[in-house]
Amino acid sequence: MPTAPAAQRTPDREQTGGHPAPRGARPARRAWETASALARWPPVRELLVVLVFCLFTSMLTWPYVTRLRDAVVDPGDPYLVTWIMWWDYHQTFRDPLHLFHSNTFYPLKYTLAFSEHCYGLALPFFPLFALGLRPLTVHAVAEFLAFALSGYGAYRLGRTLTGSQGVAWVAGIVFAFVPFRFHLMSQLVYVFSPWLPLVFEALVLFTRSRTRKRAAWLGFAFFMTGLTSVSFFAFALVPLAVCGAVLLTRYGLWRDKEFWRRSAAALSLAALGLVPFMLPYYLVSQLYGFKRSIEEVKANSAWPWHWLSVENRNKLWFGMGETMVGGATFKLFPGLFPLLFTLATLLLVEPLRAPLRVGQTGAHDKRRRLLARLDALIIFAFAVSLLAVGFDRTNYFGGLFGYVTSERALALLTAACVARVCIAYPSFLRAANANFVETLKSPRRCDAFWLGLVLALVGFLYSLGWNFFFYRICYDLLPVFRSMRVPTRGSMFAYLGLALLAGLGVRRLAEVITARRPRIRTPTVYVVACVLLLLEFNGAPLTFMRGDVYPDAVTLRLKETDMRGGIVILPASGDFNHRYMLRSADHAKPLIVGTSGFNSPQEEQIEHWTLNGTIPLSLLGLLEEIPASYVVVKNELIVPERRTNYATFFSRAVASGRLRFVNRFDNHDDLYAVVKTEPDARAEVSPPAELELRDWASMLDEDPFNLLGQYTDWSRALYRLHLVARGRMPRYAEFMQEARALGRGLIPGTEEAQRDFDGRLAALAREWEKHADFREAFGALDDARYVERLYENAGVEADASERAALANALASGAETRAGALLKVAADPRLAERGRHRALLLLHYFAFLRRSPDDPPDHNLEGFNFWLSQLERTDDLDKIALAFRDSIEYKAMKK
């Protein structure tokens, strides 16, 4: 075998000190060179960056990555977003032209537009749905990658702007793991924000080189921003325009035809592509009148001090800002190190080298005249702004300030001031440059600084919402802002700006440190800064829960059932509707109830009728009108005090033949068919025993606990009648006897139940009037003294005219003594004054089944102690818990 030339053997000898390389060294070195070359290949290099951000995400959110099958931070909005992502996938391959006609809020149209459509969020995860992963698993994976991809987007923006890997890593870490992102974890669409930095990167790339390829990338990034989040798209419009103006000024491209022609073409095509995804929001606002009220926007608008309140998932700054007003709601603190690094950017700047100039001393006469007019406009706008703020939207001066609002006057003042400094700085401002345009073009600051400054400022102003005129003028001029409820989400742009400024600050610190201590290398400074940021942003161990990843039996049954209408699931409320939305991704049938950014009128009416009080039979008419095919009742979700109302309603509905009981699943989920819509639906088993109509007396026989809950008002009314008639608290035995007498034949939960109870209570008062003990107590008293005694028993101080009016009514025969007794017992002053005493006594009756001074107490010391506690705290739940945990109650239940 021929010997290799000496020149070719030299590298091997160099590696081994002039001796031949050992066996295996050459293949290892070649493998290393191959791996290094592969790592430099752009796709692999970018993938490695993403993987590093995935590693950081795993560390800062541990153990989230170990529970991707079913991890969610709460059972609210994550379930809603999971359904939206599933629907985007499902409808894309089933009927893409009707993407917005979702299977919720049936029978309304365009219901996907009731909230974010999240199509750009769901699109990258379509393969996971295709592989058969559960919707909640896909959501968990997307949540994890949202951190990593957002960081990667900011990394790219920082690298493109500065050409520095160190700046890029700092910017990526800040943007990926800022505490506010953890605060938004319930709303994945706002956590997933890689397109925000990427659209600004595309703008920078296109500004620097106006090629067709970069124009296409700008249009695509703009399109994906709108495709992912309508809110972020709306928020991006202003900073994109301002950053574009900054870059055009710095690069002198205002008259560059290629820039305008190609950018207009790219953005127009992107906007055209977004029309099918934006038009439904306009149609929804017109069809259903959906619009965010100003009060909603105000309630979600922060104040500057809320930037010192931190998300509680952050382990280092936990609890910071909790005590300030609104601190528990607004969590905007970006972290200490990003602020310190930003200060380094602002303060550690190279000194001015150009000589200072004052004003525009050599300006042309025409420019001086323009400046004089601008100064006059500024003075005028300032004066008008003062008046507009003071008289904002009032009728003074003929309603002038209903048109010249504070935000419009302040916007005019701001525009005039910006125009003034762009032409020339005022003489009292000493600067190296004649005007702001020259300052902007100065090489003293780079593109990254100006873009970071713009983004930080605009994002900060967004967070203030209605508390600052900037957002109000956006609300007036940009219709899309009227559909957004939470202005603080716009603060994400501030964090992107701070990420860039922090990266520049670390670079400047590295320059200063290495200049003073040459032995410290620049990469070391970047590594230390990144480690400090990761330590500050740490959220591990992250608190989360295991979500309902698999469907229950009734959901699987609905999936296999053909139906002509929709499904109503009860109880319907914000606490449960998110879960129903998640399950609708499993059965894929039309759902009438649900939750979203806006809700349907039908859903709100159903929720109103079933949330409190008697469930009216009018609900059946609504179900038939919609039409609903099936009603599912989640019995385990119904609070105990509401179960009788539900049982009564469904008993009457089944008895009337308008609902048909089909079956019970998992021992607690009942399925009913709406007979008018599904006449062929058959009953598979007999209705459960609890659907049998029962009166209040039988419920009290079963458990005295039925004195409380939804029957508390009845029990308190009987208590007050007894107190006024006898001047003392009732004893357990007599009270239960009277309650059973009242409740015999009285069916709770019906629309006529309260009227029936009132009639029975009046009959009881008339019966008492005939009793010997009543006559013995009151028979010898005249009408005036009788009325006075009733008020004395009640403990209510009635004025003389009130007592005289009631006594005169008795004397004239217009009122009976039983009627007077009822009137005093129903006095609102008695109801309020004796509320705590009555409720506490009812707890003794319901839980312990005895009077307060019966054994083992023998006196009222225990009663008086708990009464003082209740009057001090007004915490009835605490009292109920104390009775439930008492040894006496537990022994009784055994």
Task: Locate the predicted segments by residue.
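Signature aromatic-anchored transmembrane alpha helix within multi-pass, membrane-resident enzymes
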Residues: 267-271, 500, 504-538
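Membrane-helix boundary/interfacial segments in multi-pass membrane proteins
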Residues: 183-190, 300-303, 320-330, 394-409, ...
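Membrane-embedded helix bundles of polyisoprenyl
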Residues: 53-56, 142-161, 165-250, 266-280, ...
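Extracytoplasmic
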Residues: 531-699
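Periplasmic/ER-lumenal interhelical loops and adjacent helix-loop junctions
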Residues: 75-91, 276-365, 369, 391-395, ...
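Membrane-interface coil-to-helix junctions
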Residues: 56-150, 178-193, 300-323, 466-471, ...
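Perimembrane helix-loop-helix junctions
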Residues: 39, 236-271, 349-360, 421, ...
